Swiss-Prot record:
Residues binding a divalent metal cation 2, per UniProt: H64, H218, E222
SUPFAM superfamilies found in the cross-reference section: NIF3 (NGG1p interacting factor 3)-like
Family: Belongs to the GTP cyclohydrolase I type 2/NIF3 family.
GO cellular component, as recorded: cytoplasm
Protein name listed in UniProt: GTP cyclohydrolase 1 type 2 homolog
Positions of a divalent metal cation 1 binding: H63, D100, E222
Source taxonomy: Archaea, Methanobacteriati, Methanobacteriota, Thermococci, Thermococcales
Subunit comment: Homohexamer.
Organism the protein comes from: Pyrococcus horikoshii (strain ATCC 700860 / DSM 12428 / JCM 9974 / NBRC 100139 / OT-3)
Amino acid sequence: MDRDEIVSFLDEFLNISAYPDKSKNGLQVEGKEEVNTIAFAVDASLDTILKAKVFNADMLIVHHGIIWGGISYVRGLIAKRLKELLVAGINLYAVHLPLDAHPEVGNNVQLLKLLNLEAKEPFGEYHGVKIGYIGEFDEPKPLPLIAQILAEKLPAEYVKSYEFGLQEVKRIAVVSGGGGFAIEEASRKADLLITGEITHEDYRVAEDLRVSVIAAGHYATETLGVKALMGVLKEKFGVKTVFIDNPTGL
């Protein structure tokens, strides 16, 4: 399959031009023109790149790429990562905020699906765009039950509940990854915020605003989008796909 055809589809399908993002979304590193195997991962770490080589991947699609705001020098770690990609001819495609926000395969829509919820409205303003969503149960549910469901569908060791608000919740706000910035907005619009991880200061903000938070793992909540995107590309282009699981424990 032609690389440029895949890239063109991804750029349009993910609407990457609509999101101001520190990440340089799109094809970050150009490799082989012919793509037969695509690897998917959360992070373009050196270890992930080396694993992509083992799978003979022609393209690596990630949520977190290697270019954030630009490259000042090609030395050290960035040089090592680029060298492995270029020597192997692996195309690197990164999609950050557009994959969080995508209405079909996005991390946050997929996170709601774990609870059998649909996205009712955009949520979580970040750099001028909404990257999360709010879903709503027909009837309020016990907060511990929601945490239990997430622990059954994501690695249980990542799921942590911070119960500062209602014990019965109906409106659920989701922002995958580091969603602590959305706590204040959640206090006004939802009964519960589900995110990946929160900081020490985020904890105090949630405590003071009396809004409950479930942190289900930064890494774990951001595997959802790349896995969903993997299915789309496999069906559309008939390429071989592989997900490289390289958890951080965070």
